[in-house]
């Protein structure tokens, strides 16, 4: 079958956007700012291009992305060394480094620690296992304190008595399947058996209850975790053609498009052999609308800041979609590589 001129142009747009994001991710998240240390990975960049804050979880995501798409031992070593410094003290690193008033800095998330652990594991072949394993051992010590009395992982370790919000990220829920999957994939000896057992128990508790997660971002995390550890149980994405994208809340028909949610959905659809090509294209178009001319990815379509984790998810999503279409994808969709 001959590809129509529109199809060729459309797929060229996806390819160019993928490459712009990749170029942006290889440099922009590691930019230096006067109040932040070298080697940290930004969670978000201001309109000026300076990092707004450094984010350990996003450092983990970035290491996993770099290992797959842009391995650079010097840059990856700098990030691992930053994590080493952040986790060398008697208390956990701040969740958002450089932000004083963020409630997230009152505690530590097991999800974040698992993503950092995954990033260190992915970086180890490029920068050496000794340094990565040293940071992982420190993180494991804090994860051990997050095993609940029932043997399952707790989501949040409180470090400060100041009140914190009741949100999905501070409650147990199906999204913890992704936490557990990351820990179970760590190299032998990195994660103590007590934590690994807690990860297994957590998956058992939530694997049949994904529909109880009522926020799409978190539900897609749960589905990503299942895709890695129990692909036969992977839930289907409920898509509303009238909306054209997934809103923040499951079942809602209101709200704006969030880049991370749309990219997460597209990645999972690329792993589903029964997914509609039309629906995949709809998601790819929505993701594309969040990409700037410079390769930055906006959290909201009209946002002027640049979000790093949205860029990481969007880059992988567009790459997988391009691969499916046979027009220059770098990596074949693989649930084991879900970032």
Model-based region annotation:
Residues 72, 126, 189, 232, ...:
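Alpha-solenoid helical repeat scaffolds
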Residues 1-97, 134-152, 185, 281-282, ...:
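Low-complexity, Ser/Thr/Pro/Gly-enriched N-terminal "stalk/linker" regions
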Residues 96-103, 160-166, 205-209, 245-252:
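Acidic/His metal-coordination segments adjacent to aromatic residues that form catalytic metal sites
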Residues 142-211:
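Solenoidal tandem-repeat scaffolds enriched in leucines and small polar residues
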Residues 98-118, 133, 137-169:
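Asp-box/WD-like beta-propeller blade repeats and closely related beta-sheet repeat scaffolds
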Residues 2-4, 51-70, 76, 106-125, ...:
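Well-ordered alpha-helical segments within folded domains of soluble proteins
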Residues 205-215, 232-305, 332-339:
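Non-catalytic carbohydrate-binding regions of carbohydrate-active enzymes
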Residues 25, 83, 120, 143-144, ...:
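Buried hydrophobic core positions in alpha-solenoid tandem helical repeats
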């Amino acid at each position: 079958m001959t590809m129509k001129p529109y199809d060729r142009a459309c797929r060229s747009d996806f390819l160019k956007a993928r490459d712009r994001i990749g170029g942006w991710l290889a440099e922009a998240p590691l930019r230096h700012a006067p109040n932040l240390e070298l080697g940290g990975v930004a969670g978000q960049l201001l309109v000026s291009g300076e990092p707004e804050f450094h984010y350990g979880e996003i450092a983990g995501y970035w290491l996993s992305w770099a290992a797959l798409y842009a391995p650079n031992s010097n840059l990856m070593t700098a990030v691992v060394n930053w994590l080493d410094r952040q986790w060398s003290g008697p208390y956990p690193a701040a969740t958002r480094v450089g932000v004083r008033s963020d409630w997230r800095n009152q505690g530590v998330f097991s999800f974040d620690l698992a993503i950092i652990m995954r990033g260190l594991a992915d970086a180890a072949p490029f920068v050496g296992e000794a340094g990565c394993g040293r940071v992982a051992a420190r993180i494991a010590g804090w994860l051990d304190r997050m095993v609940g009395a029932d043997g399952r992982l707790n989501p949040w370790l409180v470090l400060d008595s100041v009140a914190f919000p009741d949100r999905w990220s501070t409650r147990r829920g199906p999204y913890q399947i992704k936490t557990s999957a990351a820990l179970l994939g760590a190299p032998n000896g990195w994660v103590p058996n007590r934590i690994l057992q807690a990860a297994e128990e957590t998956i058992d508790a939530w694997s049949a209850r994904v529909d109880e997660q009522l926020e799409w971002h978190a539900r897609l995390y749960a589905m990503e975790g299942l895709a890695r550890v129990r692909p036969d149980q992977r839930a289907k994405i409920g898509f509303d053609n009238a909306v054209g994208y997934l809103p923040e809340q499951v079942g809602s028909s209101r709200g704006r498009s969030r880049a991370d949610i749309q990219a997460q959905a597209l990645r999972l659809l690329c792993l589903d052999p029964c997914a509609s090509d039309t629906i995949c294209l709809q998601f790819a178009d929505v993701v594309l609308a969040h990409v700037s001319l410079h390769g930055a990815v906006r959290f909201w379509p009209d946002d002027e800041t640049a979000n790093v984790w949205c860029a990481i998810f969007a880059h992988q999503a567009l790459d997988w979609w391009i691969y499916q279409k046979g027009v220059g994808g770098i990596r074949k969709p693989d649930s084991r590589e879900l970032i």
